[in-house]
Amino acid sequence: MVEGLLAERGIDLCYETVRCWANKFGPAIAANTRRKRGRADSVWHLDEMVVSINGQRMFMWRAVDKEGEVLDVLVQKRRNKVAALKLLRKLLKNQGAVPKAIVTDGLKSYPPAMKVLGCVDRHQPGRLRDNNRVENSHLPVRRRERKMQRFKSQGQAQRFVSTHSAVYKSFNTQRHLVSRNTMRKFRSAAKAEWNAASAAAA
């Protein structure tokens, strides 16, 4: 798509060039975007899903707030206490505060990890429907995974989901729920946010 848009403007390049740009600038743009959004909401939703990477079964750990904003994504080989602890430590470091509640599914790896960090009292384990917000957050990645014919390595998967999760929220607007004028405002705000993040990454 990017290749076609640039071709219309007389710029000839191949998809490999676009891929290299994404690998080089994507992580920095994603980091700048997250930094400008500030601290997350006081309720976190955590979940993990299985992904196939080069024929190997791995797990994509994801955290979102109650507004659906992706806080972090980690691709890991295990679904155990150590993996849960790694995600929680990264979240606490980046957010700078313990949330009022941490909602998860029934995975038994979460309670011992939270006990280590002293936040087990914030844990709210629930049924699948109680964590629909983070479950729905997996769907865009599933769609991209199919289009990309699976991820080739853990590093590639981590780079993609980190960048995608930071940028997707800005440009994903439910058009059928807003007026045309509101849609224009959302797009202008998203473009301004993107320009600021990409300028800082250049």
Residue locations for each model-derived region?
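Two-metal-ion RNase H-like nuclease active-site motif
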Residues: 40-53
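DNA-recognition alpha helix
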Residues: 1-11
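Mobile genetic element proteins and their domesticated derivatives, centered on retroelements
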Residues: 2, 18, 47, 63, ...
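A short, conserved beta-strand element enriched in hydrophobic/aromatic residues
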Residues: 60-64, 69-79
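C-terminal domain-tail junction helix/linker
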Residues: 145-147, 158-202
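Short, basic alpha-helical nucleic acid-contact segments in DNA-binding proteins
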Residues: 12, 20-42
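Active-site beta-loop-alpha junctions of metal-dependent nucleic acid enzymes
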Residues: 24, 73-96
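RNase H-like two-metal-ion nuclease catalytic core shared by retroviral integrases
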Residues: 126-146, 157
